[in-house]
Every structure is written in structure tokens, then in C-alpha cells.
Amino acid sequence: MKNEKWVVAIKMLPHKIYLKTLKGCLGMLLTAFLISHFSFLISSCARMGSPDGGWYDDDPPRVIGCSPEDKATNVTSKKITIYFDEFIKLADATQNVIVSPPQLEMPEIKTQGKRIVVNLIDTLKPNTTYTVDFSDAISDNNEGNPLGNYTYTFSTGEQIDTFEGAGYVLSADKLEPIQGISVGLYDDLADSAFRTKPMLRISRTDERGHFVIKGVAPGEYRVYALQDADGDFKFSQRSEMIAFSHQTYSPSCAPDTRQDTIWRDTLHIDNIVRVPYIHFYPDDVVLLAFQELQTTRNLLKIERVQPDRFTMFFTYGDSLLPVIRGLNFDSDSAFIVESNIKKDTITYWLRDTTLINQDTLRMDLTYQMTDTLGRLVEQTDSAIEVLAKTPYEKRMKQLKKDMEEWQKEQEKLKKKDEPYDSIYPVKPLEPKYNVSSSMDPHRSILIEMPTPLASLDTAAIHLYTKIDTLWYRASYDFGRKDSTLRYYELRADWQPSREYSLEIDSAAFIDIYGLVSKEYKQGIKVKSLDDYSTLVMQMIGMSDTSVVVQLLDKSENVVQQVKAESDGSASFYYINPGVYYVRAFMDRNGNGIWDTGLYDEDVQPEDVYYYNRSIECKAKWDNTLQWNLTEFKRYLQKPGELVKQKNSKSRKKQMNRNIDRAKRLGLEYVKDIKIKK
């Protein structure tokens, strides 16, 4: 009704005013209609698309220009500017950006919005190709999409050197990829060059241990790896990790094709195409990196954490023990000396309680030390003071406090008419028995004494075995383990599926301070042969040297170790069911342990090989496997499950964000992106 009156009122107006008013009203209605429908469309689009702002940007930044131009010749400027199509960031330029030839003065590398500026400090060398390898350090500022393997090149001469050489650096002992180690070329083929000259051209390994040296001129080269501690690009410190090879390389190239995978996303392949490219050689150099044995001998420190002993720590062992001359005590027969296998850690146990209670021991100490010429010489340190960490007075206060608390506890028991003690108990000797109720037939029982023994009564050690329902004495051997001071071993002919009982009388062990061991008893059940698996590795490609073969668990711990037979076989028995791996090394000196290399003596580390897959061992199974040690190149041998240095998947994670988001919206994310592996 109101609307009808409104229309009638308009019609009653004069003709011109009527037309003008009607036109204005229609315009207002049309405007309102368009606004409401536009708002509806916007809200509908928002509901159908992305309430959180659309697809993630997974495009890497693009280089749109350089100054000087990329691959420019006759360059004299030491300032380089690289321009991008968006704001970028540079991850840890010091570690990730490599300038070759190597720069003794660190270049200044920084980002400025959409550009990177590189200022070279060293004087430019004439007629030299320079490369600035950014690897994966460049990414866009917002989403972190990496540009990937970008290298800028220029030359101070008339031409650009374009050859490349590539390969892998692995740890010599475990074939683990070494990330971030420098790899360089020398055109001086003398062994001394690595010691006296900086590398000619340089690269750095990625997380796979892979390297590519770019901008190489024609010629003959030797390749080295160096964990450069002091930044001089040569082997100048014995602690530096290195790798060397006598093989020489002459770079070359040839036309080739490769398969490229075109991915719709990280899960679906769109197409596989063959792409022509220039293949540079060599592309499979393998360098085995190691650290030399540190034979420099110095005294690191002397500690007296416990009052009854003090320990000397050396950087390297020596067969000659230090000589101690006591200044405030009689050092004759004052100690029982214990050293580790390497003889770089030596513990002196004090025999006399008077010395134990003495807070300060002053002495002259004479020992073997390496001088500035690398020779072992006799060194005497005078008036050394060895201080107890906890002073005698403080120890006595603590002992008094403990006794008072014990007395209070006994008084409480006495008042309750419960059994109590009137004599403060003497602490017993407490050996550590490494034995459990279930035992493997090939194992022995280890016993660790907390202190050196004064006496040992083997007649107080009894081993019984159960046959049918009766117990009988079983024979055993008992003695020190590997000539150590405090570790003992009980060995017996353990019969599978049989029960045993280890019984040790009290006072079987008495230490140098008069502490006495308590009675000990442990039942033992030896496992059945049906619980185990047997594995025989039949090796091909062995050298004439002794070969040690190791059975490894998933954590690469050595489960068993055997020496290979002359026919190339290595047998492992009593294997508990599980997944295992096998490693072998060429034991050139026959000492049963892997030995590192020495550069000046031209000694390579002992060769290591991995069986390239896991081995499942099941109960009651006997496995025999053929193993050609050299069938696969070293960088392909170690099973991926054992490799600690994993490949980064950040690029694929960037793409997965869009895939995950598309799934949530019920859509399909399709984008042609090449991911080169």
C-alpha cells in the first residue's frame, strides 16, 4: 500500500520533474541490484576457492639480469650484481656460496631486496674463469622456494672454461656421505702441492656427499678433499679431514641424453621424456675421507675426582709409563697403575689410606712428549699439585652425618622392638656381573670390579649344570679379560638348551682396601639352537690381504666380527632373529681393527665395503649369500637405512602443501614441475 502511494505521488508531479525523478529512482534500484549481486558473487567465489588466500607460491625466483652479464669475458670489475624477479633471501652465504678459484680473503656477499651483490676482495687473476656457485642457498623471501644449483660465471680473459668434474666424498670407515667438505683440483701433480699450495679450483659437497667442480680448463689434474680448518685451502693441520688419490683426471665432455621426469605433483608422474644435454666427465670420482691418527703426545690434564685415585689424560699413548717422584709423600710402591688399551689414559690407585686422606699430592712428573720437530722427548713437569676434588674434612662431615642418620634409624627400630644393628655396616665390594637368565652359547660372563683386587679365590666360584633332574659341577676358565686390571671373564662350554647355576661365595673377591664381596647366585638358561639363524657370506673380489667381516644391527653396531677364510667365506653363528647388515674391511696389518691413512707416508685408509642391502635372519634358517665386493661403486654400496646423512626433501614439501590443501578442498592440484633428482 505504501509503495502504491509512493508511485501515485510521483505521477502527480510536473512532467519534467516526473521524468527526472523516475530516472533517478531507476538508477538507484539498478545500483542496489548490482551491488547485491556483486557481493553475492564475491562471497560465492570465496567459498569455492581459498578462504586462506589461494594456492601457495611454489615457484622459485628467476634471474632476470646480471652485471657483468653471466658468462661475460674480459671482466675487470670485482663487483657482481644478480637481479631477480622477486624478493629473495640467501641462506648462510659463508657456508653455502663457493667462489672458485678459492678466495683467501672472504668475499662480501649480501642480499638487497631483489638482488644479490658479491664483492670480491682478492685481486682478480688474469685469463681465469671465475664461478660463484650458490648451490641451493637462494630462495624466495616469502615461501622459501629454492632456486637450486645456480652458478654465475665470468672470465678475466678472452674465453670461458666450461669443463666440469663431479663425484662423491664418503667417510673412509663407514662410507657415510660427507657434507660441506671442500673438494679441489691441482694441476701440479706433485704430492707436496696439497701441503704447500692452495687449491686451483674448488667446490663443496652437498648432503649426498656429491660435488661438482665447474669452470675447469683443459688439462690433467689430481683431486683432493679437505675439511679446511684454517681457511688456507691446503692441508696444513693434521686434525683436518682429508681425502687423496693418485689417479689423475683430464676433463672432457660429449653429447648425451637423459631421462627427465615431469611430475604433476610429488606423487604422480605426468610424463618421462628424453632430453639432450652435454655430459661432462669425470662424473664418478670417489674420494674416501679420513682423519690421520693424532700421534702428537701432550699431557692434557690430571684429575682426582675420587680421593683414592688420580688419572692422567694424554693426547696419545706411549709404551713408557710416566715416572712420578713424590715430594710430600713416598712414591715407592704407592700406586697400582691401570691404563686403557691405547695407553693415553692412566689411572693411579693409591694403596695407602694415609695418601687417600691427603688432600694435596705434590710430585715431579716425567713423561714422553712431542716437541716442535715432531719427535718424542722426555719432559719433566716440576712440583705438580694433584688436589682431591672433595677435601678430607668435607668427606668426614658427610660420613659423620650418614652415621648419625643411621644411628637414629636404629634407635627407631629398637624402640619398636624390631631387629636393629649396633655396629655401623662396612660397605661391601660390589662387582658388576654382566650375566642374565638367558644366555647365548658363544658368550662369556664378564665381571667388572670397582677397584683393583688384592686377592681372588677361584675355589669360591662354582658353576653347576642341570642334566635331567640332577645338578653337576661344570668346568670353566676364569681370568682377567685382555690383560686389563679390573675386568674378569668366566668362559665355559655352554651347551644349548641346558640350565646352569653360577654361585659365588662371599669373600671370593677382596680389594686392595679390604672390602669383601658378598655371596652371589644367578640361574642361567642357554638358548636352544632353534632360536638362532646362521649366515655365510661368500665373497668375490677379495684382495690377498686379510679381510675382516662384521655383522651389524640397524644402528650399525657390530654384533659379530670374524676373519674371512682363504676361500672368501665368512660365517656367523648364533644370530638372533632380526634384520642385519654386513660390512668388510681389508685388514692390511692383521690387527683386527680398521686403520686410518697417513698422507705424508702415502698410506690410504683400509678399504671398506658394504653389502648393499639388508639381510633378514629368521630362527632355524641357514643363509648363504654371494657378495661381489666391487660390483657397486662405493657411493652406491651403503644401504639407505644405515645412511645418517639424509637427503633434504624441502622442495617436495613445498609442493606437498598445495597437494594437501587441494585434498582438503576436494580439488586436484595440477602443475607441471620438473624435479631433477
What kind of feature is each model-predicted range?
Residues E4-A9, A32:
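Acidic, Ala/Val/Gly-enriched low-complexity intrinsically disordered segments
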Residues V8-L26, S36-K677:
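N-terminal targeting or signal-anchor segments and their processing/structural boundaries
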